[in-house]
Amino acid sequence: MLVAANLRPAVVSVAPLVDEIMADLGFGSALAGMLTALPVLFFGLSAPFAPKLAARFGIERTVFGALIVLIAGMGLRFVPDVACLFVGSAVIGAAIGVCNVVLPALVKRDFAHRSGLMTGLYSMTLSGGAAVAAGLTVPIDQRLGGDWQVTLVSWGLLAVLALFVWIPQLSTTHRVVASGPSGSLLRNPIAWAITVFMGSQSLVFYTFSAWLPQYLLDDGRSAAQAGVILATGQAMALVAGLVIPIVAGRWADQRLVTLAVISLCAAGFVGLLSTDHLTTLWVMLVMFGPGASISLALLFMVLRSPSTAVTGQVSGMAQSIGYVVAAVGPILIGGLHDLSGSWSFAMGALGLALIPQGVAALWAARDVKMVL
């Protein structure tokens, strides 16, 4: 779980500082969106290699190596060079992308009989790391005198801790069957439904998390207030990520629960765009959606797969394609804001991602296992 706690802070911590980074480096919204999108893009680009790495070195050593790469990527952000900032973000994304794929396979292997609970705990830890990063990044930055580079690198201390705690796991090596998605998997409608579901919820989560602080700053709030609201939303995602998969796991068919989650997220977007009041509530509802949905996506991978090997393959497929699609979000929404001058238009466009997510849920949440 300490490893899972490291899979979001390096990404989420950029958003509360994006205004400071833009001012310091002279970025526009589109380029800043590219900076926030780069790790998500490399989540997807590195995902197909994760099953092969786990087959070659074992899950335990693969995670250990990914943590080393994560720490190296965060260190690159300290180098006073714009190129290193972007390269470091890409390296961070590649490391996290590998862990994103192999950890659900670990849940399938070791906790198949408690998949709902363990998926919820895993997702809660992901969201918890994001919430802590969202809430503490600005106070850390202020304590460090407004040095955003040092602030970003400081989150590497958590990764160093996880690295040392993981060392005892290296005494055992569990290899999984190699390969990425097979041809039959690529033709399987359930696998594609999980992929679309994963991509849609990731698009909403990372794009909303990336631009919410700037949206709030432009609305007249301070950086500290924006950080608190984002952290509150992330905390709601944490609760949703823990509770919803446990509830959904009680039924063989998860369609009703999943559509209810998507509806709450849609209500949050409507409220945020239609009134200036109750902003924190609307943010909480929006973040409830992807917070629960990432848990549901991981649960679908476990429940719909006939074996640990297939879980790893589905995870690799869903995350490689899904995260590449999601990476477009921060850039697209930043560009739409620059073109229209309106956050309402840009955020409204983001809310449309809930439509394909809802359609995909009708297939992914059914009580049917993949037949390959």
Language-model segments: which ranges?
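Helix-to-loop junctions at the C-terminal end of transmembrane segments
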Residues: 46-58, 240-253
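Residue-level signature of mid-helix packing/kink "hotspots" within the transmembrane helices
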Residues: 12, 40-48, 131, 234-242, ...
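A late C-terminal transmembrane helix in Major Facilitator Superfamily
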Residues: 308-343, 350
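Conserved MFS/SLC helix-loop-helix module at the cytosolic interface between two early adjacent transmembrane helices
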Residues: 45-83
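Helix-loop-helix hairpin linking two adjacent transmembrane segments in secondary transporters
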Residues: 82, 113-114, 120-171
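C-terminal transmembrane helical hairpin of 12-TM major facilitator-type secondary transporters
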Residues: 254-297
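Cytoplasmic helix-loop-helix junction between adjacent transmembrane helices
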Residues: 89-124
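Extracytoplasmic gate region of multi-pass secondary transporters
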Residues: 15, 189-241
